[in-house]
Amino acid sequence: MKKNPIFVHKFALMRQMIALFAATLLLGGCWSARERQIIADGDGLMRVLQVTEPYDSVVLRAVSIEFQASMLNSATYRRLCERMLLTVQDPEHEGVGIAAPQVGINRRLVAVQRFDKEGEPFEFYPNLRILTARGDSVAGPEGCLSVPGLRGIVRRSRDIDVRYLNPATLRDTTERVTGFTAVIFQHEADHLAGTFYTDKADSLFTE
């Protein structure tokens, strides 16, 4: 098959972007200049990355890294949470959860709407990990702010244990979560591993 020069150029560009993100992730213990720029660029909604865009896809498919505890006391962290909350609550593209990679930040941070709590508040979970999944998986519909125009049927546990770095105490905290809220946690945790619900779906359909 004849080599396409346009394809070769795009492939080389993609490799450069992957190398750039790998270098950024090695910093780990502090905010990178790129992260600070994205978070400080405005006070309102953040752009939600789309898997259909090649550059966005590189970010979305990367494995996110953990925060150092000291980072949670920074103005940069607080601003990121504020802007992520505004973004997931945007009336035009409202969601029930969002992960930091979806707004261009490859850190282990998710916001989840707690339908299992009074008032159904959004709460943030840095360094989130799913520890245990109990019982049979149940099939249910899912969509994603980063996957436009599609929905799918995905099997998830309705009873899980999660661990996260508590922003108030700066200590690891373990919590049991059940029901639909457990599904949201699993969906958002997948983003931190560079995975989409479409990778696990039994079937996909257009909205």
Where are the predicted features?
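Positively charged
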Residues: 28-207
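Bacterial N-terminal signal peptides
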Residues: 19-28
